[in-house]
Structure formats: C-alpha cells, structure tokens
C-alpha cells in the first residue's frame, strides 16, 4: 500500500491530486500500519512468553510511520500541481524517483515477508539524488522569483519531504536487514531438524 501511495503522491506533485484520492491513499497506508501494530502486539506477547523468537516490530513500525508522515507532506504538496516552468525542470526527476521509491518499497515488503536481505538501495539513492540536483538547479534558475508564496512553500516542502524520505528509506533498509538476519537462523534451524 505504501509503495503505490508514495508513487501516486510523487506523481501528483507534477499534475495534482484530488483531496479524495489523497485521503484514500492515506487511509490505505494507515490501515496497513494499524494491522501491523496489532500483529506486533501479539508477537510481543508471544516473545515475552518465549513462544516466538520473531524480531521486535516496534522499530519497523516507527520507520513506517515516518514514511507515512513523508507521504502526508508529499500529498499536501500534490493537492495542486507545481507551475509548468518548475515541473519542466523537476518533473522528470520526480517521475524517476516515484518509480524507484515504489519499486524499492515493494521489494522491501517482499523481503520482509520472505526474511531475505533488503533490496539494493542504489537505484532509489540515485533517483532521490537526481531529484535533489533538479531542485537545486531549479533554485538556481530564477524561476522561483515568479512563484506565489503558496507555490514557493509547496516547492520547498516537497524538497524537504524528499530529503526526509531518503533518510527514512535508509532506516527502512536497516530494519529489513535486521528482520532478514533474525529470520535466517530460524530457517536454518528448522531446516536442520
């Protein structure tokens, strides 16, 4: 749910997203996180009774909630499209980032389900780096002088959200790696019996 929602929100920055669509995206991700929290509480009870050796889901939950916050910030900027002159400069980089982030999140989800190592982060790092460069280039062109205060606020908010997203995806990488490491001994142990 998060992969599709972040991808849609990033795409919406260039062409705009209706508030109802954004609300639906948020609800889907929040529902998934709520289900994860329920499973996490049950797993904590099992761990405390020594019925399970599953990793603690709390750090993963915190990271996913941070990603939800990134989605909300990006979604708020996507309510109205950025002006064409800005979109021309940052749109291609945002499209690349949208695809890379969506793919990375889907692959992280698959890794969590299978207990495997996280996917390579290089493509998403490259795409978000290209976004940062595109936003820096846009700041240097003088285009921003022609923006209204609201447009300027949205421009800087999306830049900030992308920086936060990069940090939170790095955190997610660590959490997926921890889950994969915790799952590997259990699989090896089960296979040897």
Question: Can you name each region flagged by the protein language model?
Answer:
Residues 1-61, 101, 105-121:
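Non-transmembrane accessory domains of multi-pass membrane transporters/channels
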Residues 3-10, 63-192:
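Soluble C-terminal extramembrane regulatory/interaction domains of multi-pass membrane proteins
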């Amino acid at each position: 749910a998060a992969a599709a929602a972040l991808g849609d929100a990033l795409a919406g920055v260039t062409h705009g997203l209706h508030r109802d669509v954004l609300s639906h995206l948020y609800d889907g991700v929040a529902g998934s996180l709520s289900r994860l929290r329920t499973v996490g509480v049950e797993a904590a009870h099992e761990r405390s009774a020594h019925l399970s050796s599953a990793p603690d889901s709390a750090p993963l939950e915190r990271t996913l909630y941070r990603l939800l916050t990134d989605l909300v910030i990006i979604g708020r900027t996507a309510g109205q499209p950025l002006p064409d002159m800005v979109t021309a400069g940052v749109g291609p980089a945002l499209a690349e980032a949208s695809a890379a982030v969506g793919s990375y999140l889907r692959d992280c989800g698959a890794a969590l389900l299978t207990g495997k190592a996280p996917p390579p982060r290089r493509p998403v790092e490259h795409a978000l780096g290209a976004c940062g460069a595109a936003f820096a280039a846009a700041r240097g062109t003088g285009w921003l002088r022609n923006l209204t205060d609201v447009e300027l606020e949205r421009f800087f908010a999306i830049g900030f959200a992308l920086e936060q997203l990069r940090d939170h995806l790095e955190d997610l990488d660590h959490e997926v790696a921890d889950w994969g490491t915790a799952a590997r001994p259990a699989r090896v142990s089960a296979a040897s019996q």
